[in-house]
Amino acid sequence: MSDRLTLLRPDDWHIHLRDGAVLPHTVGDVARTFARAIIMPNLVPPVRNAAEAGAYRERILAARPAGSRFEPLMVLYLTDRTSPEDVRAAKASGIVYAAKLYPAGATTNSDSGVTSIDNIFPAIEALAEVGMPLLVHGEVTRSEIDVFDREKRFIDEHMRRVVERFPTLKVVFEHITTSDAAQFVTEAPANVGATITAQHLLYNRNHMLVGGIRPHFYCLPILKRNTHQVALLDAATSGNPKFFLGTDSAPHARHAKEAACGCAGCYTAYAAIEMYAEAFEQRNALDKLEGFASLHGPAFYGLPANTDTITLVREEWTAPDSLPFGEQTVVPLRAGEKLRWRLLEENA
């Protein structure tokens, strides 16, 4: 078994960078490993049009480390009021690569999200016409639906209908967490793909809840039972190009996580590819990591793969207990724990 693993430089097809004083920290972490990233638009206020996307992009570019060529790929936040003209203008801007469907109330800063998918059918039709992917946070939000069932219910109530109604639309089922979602994507047409996070490959709800509540494992969609974790590992390591890397790295200040009503989100950008390598190694599937991390995503988006490389070495190191986050700190996933792979920084 080799102690070195060289991959074409990967991209992150789903990340939260936040805004303001924290950007130098979050952008620095993602740029360390990834060439490009799909930037989530759930700011306050959200990124609703091409002009707002352009302004946010400039703030991200200004926060890049010296010499970095990291490229943010911007995303439009869909609301009930998003028009086909908004979609066409976003496409014409050349900097917006997708549009994001957040059901209202599904996750952090989603209050401006879509209250009924039917409300945005004209915008979705425009997405299909211009060839821009629809990114979907696939959970229903009705209070009577159990939090562990919300992804499956979304598939049954909405996802199948959208895919059937818009057969040419590229759809990314983001951060899938269930065997139901993995099966749906596998059986769907080629224009339907999915991202999978490192935490959903490495952990299940027992890790979050047994022996005490661990708030830094709490994210949305929530970790599920181990049978779903196994199904996600099967999908990610299968070599199926429908599945690709999306960290959903989502930082919150320590006090916002370690609280009586803590925020959802795991911060993984600082060591994401190292964590994915651990998950793939558990399946003896390190040979499949480059496809998942570096090839499948660009192919789905119709973009070229990166040509430079990164190298991981099998070397234990201890994750930091906390990281700077503006004037505060963020506790990363795996804080204080050993990681088995390390990125050679000279290749970053």
UniProtKB/Swiss-Prot annotation:
Main EC class the enzyme belongs to: hydrolase
Gene3D superfamilies: Metal-dependent hydrolases (3.20.20.140)
Pathway entry: Pyrimidine metabolism; UMP biosynthesis via de novo pathway; (S)-dihydroorotate from bicarbonate: step 3/3
GO biological process, one term: 'de novo' UMP biosynthetic process
Cofactor binding comment, as recorded: Binds 2 Zn(2+) ions per subunit.
Keyword Zinc: yes
GO MF terms, alphabetically ordered: dihydroorotase activity; zinc ion binding
Hydrolase in keyword set: yes
Catalytic activity: (S)-dihydroorotate + H2O = N-carbamoyl-L-aspartate + H(+)
Binding of Zn(2+) 1, residues: H14, H16, K100, D248
EC number: 3.5.2.3
Active-site residues, Swiss-Prot/TrEMBL: D248
Keywords per UniProt: Hydrolase, Metal-binding, Pyrimidine biosynthesis, Zinc
N6-carboxylysine modification, residue list: K100
Binding site for Zn(2+) 2: K100, H137, H175
Any single Gene Ontology cellular-component annotation: cytosol
The protein's required cofactors: Zn(2+)
InterPro entries for this protein: Amidohydro-rel, DHOdimr, Dihydroorotase_CS, Metal_Hydrolase
SUPFAM superfamilies: Metallo-dependent hydrolases
Binding-site positions, substrate: H16, L17, R18, N42, H137, L220, H252, A264
Sequence similarity: Belongs to the metallo-dependent hydrolases superfamily. DHOase family. Class II DHOase subfamily.
Biological function: Catalyzes the reversible cyclization of carbamoyl aspartate to dihydroorotate.
Subunit structure: Homodimer.
Name the UniProt record assigns to this protein: Dihydroorotase
